[in-house]
Amino acid sequence: MPELPEVETSRRGISPYLVGHTILYAEVRNARLRWPVSAEILSLSDEPVLSVRRRAKYLLIELTHGWIIVHLGMSGSLRILPEYSEPEKHDHVDLVMDSGKVLRYTDPRRFGAWLWTDSLETSSVLAHLGPEPLEAEFFADYLYQASRGKKTAIKQWIMDNKVVVGVGNIYASESLFAAGIHPDRAAGSLNENDADVLVRVIKQVLQLSIEQGGTTLRDFLQSDGKPGYFAQELRVYGRNGEPCRTCGTPIETAKHGQRSTFFCRRCQV
């Protein structure tokens, strides 16, 4: 599933081909995604693109009269292609640009979304989101105070978008390993030093993944069709039974909220 680094990688990849250009029209071959493609997108015509932003795992394409909100779901990806590129089976949405390029949305599992909003402030999918992990609003004392009294396992807790956005399964496992924190620990057990270290490594892990173009495990590709390379940097995720790269202890796995968690029993306490 594309997480924050993959979405940010997509944003950076598509922005130069959209901003300052005009969407001539949208071609929707299959509107039945997680939610039906919004009618306003189906009727787009000669709409200049003003900006491409990201909030959590949502891409926000700013137009003159509103915003397209794109969520990549479980298996979605965006690519920039020549306008007349032949679509394949899972290519569901195209934004045809005045430059002769097309932004193509591919989603084999169709769990993604293409939505419309007149204003970001009134969008229900953006309401109640927590702070951005790479911004100054996500800091040690915030995390420490928010964790007081929480009995939920720390792994599951930091994946809650109301706590902090965009820390999905891969990066939660990797960040907890880097911080030396066992994923089963109650969130409320964090002390101030734990919170300081965890905030710092979350920022580092996410930033490194963005620099590497994200993590390609199955479906994610960058906007130029290339894979992300952060998978080569993974210390615990997907390495069940393999030796820890720090101490040699076999990596273990457990379930948190129906998600697989990977950790080292010796390095994480």
Swiss-Prot record:
Binds 1 zinc ion per subunit. Its EC number is 3.2.2.23, 4.2.99.18. InterPro entries: DNA_glyclase/AP_lyase_DNA-bd, DNA_glyclase_Znf_dom_DNA_BS, Formamido-pyr_DNA_Glyclase, FPG_cat, MutM-like_N-ter, Ribosomal_uS13-like_H2TH, Znf_DNA_glyclase/AP_lyase, Znf_FPG/IleRS. GO terms for biological process: base-excision repair. DNA binds at residues 90, 109, 150. It catalyses: Hydrolysis of DNA containing ring-opened 7-methylguanine residues, releasing 2,6-diamino-4-hydroxy-5-(N-methyl)formamidopyrimidine; 2'-deoxyribonucleotide-(2'-deoxyribose 5'-phosphate)-2'-deoxyribonucleotide-DNA = a 3'-end 2'-deoxyribonucleotide-(2,3-dehydro-2,3-deoxyribose 5'-phosphate)-DNA + a 5'-end 5'-phospho-2'-deoxyribonucleoside-DNA + H(+). The active site is at residues 2-3, 57, 259. The keyword Metal-binding applies. Disulfide bonds: none annotated. A zinc finger (FPG-type) spans 235-269. Keywords: DNA damage, DNA repair, DNA-binding, Glycosidase, Hydrolase, Lyase, Metal-binding, Multifunctional enzyme, Zinc, Zinc-finger. Monomer. Involved in base excision repair of DNA damaged by oxidation or by mutagenic agents. Acts as a DNA glycosylase that recognizes and removes damaged bases. Has a preference for oxidized purines, such as 7,8-dihydro-8-oxoguanine (8-oxoG). Has AP (apurinic/apyrimidinic) lyase activity and introduces nicks in the DNA strand. Cleaves the DNA backbone by beta-delta elimination to generate a single-strand break at the site of the removed base with both 3'- and 5'-phosphates. Belongs to the FPG family. This is Formamidopyrimidine-DNA glycosylase. It comes from Pectobacterium atrosepticum (strain SCRI 1043 / ATCC BAA-672) (Erwinia carotovora subsp. atroseptica). The lineage of its organism: Bacteria, Pseudomonadati, Pseudomonadota, Gammaproteobacteria, Enterobacterales.
